[in-house]
Swiss-Prot record:
Keywords: Aminotransferase, Cytoplasm, Lyase, Mitochondrion, Pyridoxal phosphate, Transferase, Transit peptide
Annotated family: Belongs to the class-I pyridoxal-phosphate-dependent aminotransferase family.
Residues binding substrate, per UniProt: 36, 185, 398
Purpose of the protein: Catalyzes the irreversible transamination of the L-tryptophan metabolite L-kynurenine to form kynurenic acid (KA), an intermediate in the tryptophan catabolic pathway which is also a broad spectrum antagonist of the three ionotropic excitatory amino acid receptors among others. Metabolizes the cysteine conjugates of certain halogenated alkenes and alkanes to form reactive metabolites. Catalyzes the beta-elimination of S-conjugates and Se-conjugates of L-(seleno)cysteine, resulting in the cleavage of the C-S or C-Se bond.
Cofactor(s) required, per the database record: pyridoxal 5'-phosphate
Catalysed reactions listed for this entry: L-kynurenine + 2-oxoglutarate = kynurenate + L-glutamate + H2O; 3-phenylpyruvate + L-glutamine = 2-oxoglutaramate + L-phenylalanine; an S-substituted L-cysteine + H2O = a thiol + pyruvate + NH4(+)
Assembly: Homodimer.
The protein, known as: Kynurenine--oxoglutarate transaminase 1
GO cellular component assignments: cytoplasm; cytosol; mitochondrial matrix; mitochondrion
GO MF, one example: kynurenine-oxoglutarate transaminase activity
Positions where N6-(pyridoxal phosphate)lysine occurs in the chain: 247
InterPro entries assigned to the protein according to its UniProt record, in alphabetical order: Aminotransferase_I/II_large, Kynurenine-oxoglutarate_AT, PyrdxlP-dep_Trfase, PyrdxlP-dep_Trfase_major, PyrdxlP-dep_Trfase_small
This protein's pathway: Amino-acid degradation; L-kynurenine degradation; kynurenate from L-kynurenine: step 1/2
Amino acid sequence: MTKRLQARRLDGIDQNLWVEFGKLTKEYDVVNLGQGFPDFSPPDFATQAFQQATSGNFMLNQYTRAFGYPPLTNVLASFFGKLLGQEMDPLTNVLVTVGAYGALFTRFQALVDEGDEVIIMEPAFDCYEPMTMMAGGCPVFVTLKPSPAPKGKLGASNDWQLDPAELASKFTPRTKILVLNTPNNPLGKVFSRMELELVANLCQQHDVVCISDEVYQWLVYDGHQHVSIASLPGMWDRTLTIGSAGKSFSATGWKVGWVMGPDNIMKHLRTVHQNSIFHCPTQAQAAVAQCFEREQQHFGQPSSYFLQLPQAMELNRDHMIRSLQSVGLKLWISQGSYFLIADISDFKSKMPDLPGAEDEPYDRRFAKWMIKNMGLVGIPVSTFFSRPHQKDFDHYIRFCFVKDKATLQAMDERLRKWKELQP
């Protein structure tokens, strides 16, 4: 065809690191510590709930309410209403989506107009920018910057800090949305109450909606506490909070997510949802409903999966830190999420001429070198930064530690071989 095929909204967002790295992982014998998914089974109660949903009530094979299976929206409203200090209506304050990804896309499409500005704190989950652009918005970036670690000690993810003055300077009359992600992907940073209060005050001062991506809210470590910004004074009325069943119950393939917020905003999301996705798989929603009903009974007790999972993953994190240190990687201690990041600055000075395109960030070339030569997959952190800042942050690699023990043992074996090759 001679006519232009692709819509202009796709300009500049057609290149995707995940496609390229996914292909590389198939070509080489690797231990995949790159993508954020568990390679262990969900808890027994979750798999049993899914089995029951697929083999029990035959009507679960049919459509349910478009905006969410009623038992699921009921339990989400009850469970999170207590945490947020809100009386939530399951019909108007909760929308079930195809994963948290679907919730994000629906919100950008519902709220962002041509020329609207969206503040994104980077490093950021890499779909925020293209989703903003597809909706016609203009991404505006605020960069978290690391404080140097004390000599002889590891840095912590919470050492990556916002500059309050820089953040305040990004708000303009065109600012429509601020995107918050806590715990943060890729850093593992858990935003403190003081940081959230700063963000909340600015959102209220400038009449801005906060999109709060909290899919890792149960995965916090070392006694840190996740705080939902919607629970702060004055923020419920301007916050949309995103959650994920996949991250909550270690079942990322179920693709059930949700968004919660005030009806005057949610009604616009429902309009997008009913004219795009329309409906999410009933059986998966039924399984998630059972999982939350079970968790509601055990919440705060040792039998709670939301306590058991972070306890187990904290041990995984510590294992990975020790192992990666053995080959000279400098680690930042993750305080939340699936991930931690490693500083590869020393390798950049020792191995500056790795193969790759001239304008390709160093961490991307290093990650490919690891795949091809060491059989380890990590994700270059520069991909989570806006293009103008990628060269400034091209010396970090993200690793996922939410993996099975066998995977961590396979990682150890690759690292032993790596260490043997070092001079």
